[in-house]
Amino acid sequence: PEKEDRIPKTLNWDLFTGPAKMNPYNEIYHPWNWRGWWDYGTGALGDMACHILHQPFRALKLLYPTKVEGSSTLLLNACAPQAQHVKLTFPARENMPKVAMPEVEVHWYDGGMMPDRPKGFPEGKQLMQSGGGLTIFHGTKDTLICGCYGQNPWLLSGRVPNAPKVCRRVPKAMNGGHEMDWVRACKESPSSRVMPKSDFSEAGPMNEMVAMGVLAIRLQGLNKTLEWDGANMRFTNIGDDETLRTVIKDGFKIHNGHPSFDKTWTDPVNAKAFAEEPVSYTHLTLP
């Protein structure tokens, strides 16, 4: 934003900013759109993928991807794009009873970008389910469709499986039960604690997967599939001398019916250092 707005009396801008870069206050940041600016959030991926991608992460026993690539509408240096697509490739995992776990691709779309309609999807039926999101599992024998947050799952064939209930269910999960399950676990003795459904041992790696998608979008200017070493938390195919530029301002104009393009770019930065910074948390210094 090019202008500075008056800070509302009800807002402590310094406290809100915390360890992030101190920017002049602008009403576009708060209370909702802060998540779209890189100084404060991670765009639609950080906002919704932590909910929608939890189903494949848990069901398919995913951990670290080995490859990732991203593409989007115009990417600016200060904020997330309007629409984006990320592809994450995960290695084969240990097979489960009656279910093989080969290498698998996970695709994320947002901002109006959509996956292809699965073969056999009912004509006239909207692909997007209620809640503004869906997950499609493409299997060798059937296709599973889940609504936003994994709700209302159904098989494309119409078959109703006799699915065993193998996971503990949280009562009233969508109405405060999920949060109280976490509070309950915090209060229990470690010796007898029933782990919450939102345990950090699962939530941490799952959110690393989401953040990897954000990095893929921000590194798309390298024009390559990025290879990831999860154990050592680093990309293995970004060279020491590779550089990256991002658009600061899109100077697109139409004059007398003719378009003109006059983008303002950042200076080139070292791509390897740029990729390492979000992983190392160098922006946050603790005493």
Ranges and model annotations:
Residues L45-M48, L53, F57-L60, Y64-L284:
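Glycine-enriched catalytic-core subsegment of oxygenase/oxidase enzymes
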Residues F16, T282-P287:
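Conserved small/polar residues in nucleotide/adenosyl-binding loops
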Residues P1-Y64, E202, M206:
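Mid-domain beta-loop-alpha active-site segment that forms a flexible
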